[in-house]
Design a protein with these regions (language model features):
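N-terminal glycine-rich phosphate-binding loop for ADP-containing cofactors
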Residues: 1-264
Length: 264
């Protein structure tokens, strides 16, 4: 069993409200926190819509949907959001300066028992952990978009993360019905983005060299390599702005990881 009962999710965007819904679905009590009530209102509407779709498809009853929705409490005040929480999952935008400010504020109010987790897709866990008062109880939990559907979660310990935090995190991910993959080293891009981001750039190079057309490249990986989506299709779904930021971050930390294409 995990030592987690109450979870606070910081950030109510696509990832934040998705993570909140996933965890609430299996019975966790969730506080969803953002800096403005309007952001939270929008997030709760999206959660209600998502649960409504599951009811329409007869994947859950209306009573179950209402119970899940009722386990998510939207809160603006950070101090209130962190009361008695066992696990904080930070899902704010991928900007290190913003995360520095967030963790400085969190450290002011978080209780000693609270574990910290970041949903970052590229930023180094060890560096973020060093910004806090508890680097041994800091870990990366990288969910994929949309969290309600994607089964994989990368679990990334920092250099100082202790074994108990790793164990609790792995148990949590399994408890919410996801498949954890443990990254044994806090490397640039972790596992998935270390493979996927360079792949997008290489596909762009193939396109640029007139080796193949975009549809041919996507068809090749879908029908020959059994990818569920084409490389460009997935890049478009992910968002080229997201891929650009991830590429920039990865290159700044290890120039050998990517052969960057100027269009990306």
């Amino acid at each position: 069993m995990t030592a987690v009962n109450k979870i606070t999710v910081l950030g109510s965007g696509i990832m934040g409200h998705g993570i909140a819904q996933v965890a609430a679905t299996v019975g966790y009590n969730i506080v969803l926190r953002d800096i403005e009530q309007s952001f939270l209102d929008n997030a709760m509407k999206k959660i209600k819509w998502s649960l409504g779709k599951l009811v329409e498809k007869r994947k859950m009853s209306q009573n179950d949907a209402d119970s899940i929705y009722g386990r998510i409490t939207p809160v603006v005040d950070l101090k209130d959001a962190l009361k008695e929480t066992d696990l904080l999952i930070e899902a704010v935008p991928e900007e290190m300066e913003l995360k520095k400010k967030v963790y400085a504020d969190v450290d002011t109010y978080a209780e000693d028992k609270t574990l910290y987790a970041s949903n970052t897709s590229t930023l180094p866990i060890s560096e973020m952990a060093s910004l806090t008062s508890r680097p041994s109880r800091f870990i990366g939990l990288h969910f994929f978009n949309p969290p309600q559907l994607m089964p994989l979660v990368e679990v990334i310990p920092g250099r100082l993360t202790d074994s108990r935090t790793v164990s609790i995190s792995l148990d949590l991910i399994r408890n919410i019905g996801k498949e954890p993959v443990l990254c044994k080293k806090d490397v640039v891009g972790f596992i998935v983005n270390r493979i996927f981001i360079p792949l997008v750039h290489e596909a762009a190079h193939c396109l640029d060299r007139d080796t193949a057309e975009m549809t041919q490249i996507d068809s090749a990986v879908k029908f020959k390599m059994a990818f569920p989506m084409g490389i460009f299709e997935l890049a478009d779904y992910t968002g080229l702005d997201v891929i650009y930021k991830a590429s920039k971050e990865m290159i700044s930390r290890d120039k050998k990881v990517i052969n960057p294409h100027p269009l990306i």
